[in-house]
């Protein structure tokens, strides 16, 4: 399946890494319904940004998981290739 990196540019004020961990857990509970697998995420609390690496059939399928799981949809989703 293709890999995508989604970018959340502006999280709600005061969002912490533990909040993102909870959202990720909700993604994991929802992902099978859409044939998606959220692999990793990175949080920049200071900048209010989150980056999620996802294995998904389409960018739209990845977005549907976020929307259903917690409503925090990404601002941008990029197709990416893994390097060494």
Residue ranges and their predicted role:
Residues 1-33, 37-39, 43-48, 65, ...:
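Short S/T/G/P-rich N-terminal loop/turn motif that feeds into the first structured element of a domain
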Residues 55-84:
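An amphipathic, aromatic/His-enriched active-site/gating alpha helix that lines ligand/cofactor pockets
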């Amino acid at each position: 399946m293709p890999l995508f990196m989604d970018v959340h540019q502006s999280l709600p004020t005061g969002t912490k890494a533990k909040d993102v961990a909870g959202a990720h857990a909700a993604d994991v509970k929802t992902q099978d319904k859409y044939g998606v697998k959220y692999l990793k995420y990175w949080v920049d609390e200071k900048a209010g940004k989150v980056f999620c690496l996802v294995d998904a059939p389409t960018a739209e399928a990845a977005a549907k998981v976020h929307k259903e799981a917690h409503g925090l949809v990404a601002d941008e989703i990029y197709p990416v290739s893994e390097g060494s």
